[in-house]
Amino acid sequence: MSRAKAAPVAGPEVAANRAGRQARIVAILSSAQVRSQNELAALLAAEGIEVTQATLSRDLEELGAVKLRGADGGTGIYVVPEDGSPVRGVSGGTDRMARLLGELLVSTDDSGNLAVLRTPPGAAHYLASAIDRAALPQVVGTIAGDDTILVVAREPTTGAQLAGMFENFGKESHVRARHPGLFRRSGHLGGDQLDRQGDRP
């Protein structure tokens, strides 16, 4: 297993206060899969930022960081909720949503214009936030519980189509991680489509 790598260092002066230190924590958690506070402390130390366990715990609490387990039940990783309004059409938001669907989506169901997404316990709000930020034109909005997300489809999209779209995003994120050259961008419902030319010898 490859070890997590720290995000690019912004300079020692940036981490001279709590705000700067917490900004580096957010950057690290956004770019690396950190599974423990000791691992995070080591990554900070590699940037010249020494922090005690108590201070690090307080920073994580103030940042709203949570430790989420993937759908496979493996070791959890720390994540920090993103602030800010969704920007429609920005591919980064859609890519992030697809990656989280691949990691957190357990199952789907549908009824009428509603899609129901199941996640591991405690992960629903985090995934719903990513869906909201992606600002998909087919989605009116989301309601999240502990492990269930209710997604309202915008007409003429149906709940079944929406559930299928999220399943496709999740499946494609797994394939993209292993074979990034097989995908091309598409405007069709369901995100990226496989480029069958990539299957040719």
UniProtKB/Swiss-Prot annotation:
One of its GO terms (biological process) is regulation of arginine biosynthetic process. Its main location: cytoplasm. Pfam families: Arg_repressor (PF01316), Arg_repressor_C (PF02863). Pathway: Amino-acid biosynthesis; L-arginine biosynthesis [regulation]. GO terms for cellular component: cytoplasm. Keywords: Amino-acid biosynthesis, Arginine biosynthesis, Cytoplasm, DNA-binding, Repressor, Transcription, Transcription regulation. InterPro entries: Arg_repress, Arg_repress_C, Arg_repress_C_sf, Arg_repress_DNA-bd, WH-like_DNA-bd_sf, WH_DNA-bd_sf. GO terms for molecular function: arginine binding; DNA binding; DNA-binding transcription factor activity. It is found in: Cytoplasm. The keyword Repressor applies. Residues 182-201 are annotated as: Disordered. The keyword DNA-binding applies. Regulates arginine biosynthesis genes. Belongs to the ArgR family. This is Arginine repressor. It comes from Mycobacterium tuberculosis (strain CDC 1551 / Oshkosh). The lineage of its organism: Bacteria, Bacillati, Actinomycetota, Actinomycetes, Mycobacteriales. The gene is argR.
